[in-house]
């Protein structure tokens, strides 16, 4: 009797190991995309924003959720600076078209502090930007949580 019970339990465990989640369960999972911007280049910034917009539109058409985090650090922080961003209007439009909380613009505080020291004044950030302690650590932690990583 015990042998039969153990064999049934073993078969059940093996079956569960080789059974994937149903397509309906996969569709219910939100997608997570982290996009890195580390260059002070309007083309790279626009490419990152285009990637984000394309992902939003794609998943919206499929009635699926997507969370996007665009993290700017190093020279790429200019993307989120209120005084130097060449793409601030596009950032505002993108933020306005997306459900609140579905897109975040993360600004590296290490870079911000370095720029403030070098320039001798406070660096104004766009209102859409959220300052994170370290951009590279932020991206790394998102990846550890299962986010897909994109570098345009």
Model region roles, listed by residue range:
Residues 23-152:
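Secreted/extracellular ectodomain signature
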Residues 1-4:
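N-terminal secretory signal peptides that target proteins for export/translocation
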Residues 8-17:
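Bacterial N-terminal signal peptides
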